[in-house]
């Protein structure tokens, strides 16, 4: 089974494709991700791939928080005083929106992860 994901917006474009089907749909671009034979569970927005039913399902709150914490850990350096970029305020806003996810949404199905600056 092949899945094509829009890497920019994290949308699943096609899933459950055969080798022949994916060849005609995959456009060479860095924007699209082709996945197969998953070593890890792909996650797209607030959903993850359930390998038993080969479809995307909503994550649990625990998984959402783990994802959020991973993103925060990987972007910590952008909040340090020595960060060389001129987009530090945008990163701080983005990181605050990530921290606010559990308070801002009542249901995991409604979560919209903020867009990275």
Region roles according to the model:
Residues 1-117:
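A preference for well-ordered globular domain cores
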């Amino acid at each position: 089974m092949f899945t094509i994901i829009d890497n920019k917006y994290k949308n699943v474009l096609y899933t459950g494709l055969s080798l022949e089907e994916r060849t005609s749909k995959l456009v060479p671009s860095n924007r699209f991700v082709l996945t197969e034979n998953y070593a890890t569970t792909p996650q797209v927005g607030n959903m993850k791939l359930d390998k038993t039913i080969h479809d995307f399902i909503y994550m649990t709150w625990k998984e959402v928080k783990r994802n959020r914490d991973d993103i925060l850990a990987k972007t910590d350096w952008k909040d340090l005083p020595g960060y060389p970029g001129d987009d530090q305020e945008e990163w701080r806003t983005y990181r605050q929106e990530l921290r606010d996810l559990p308070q801002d949404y009542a249901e995991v199905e409604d979560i919209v992860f903020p867009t990275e600056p």
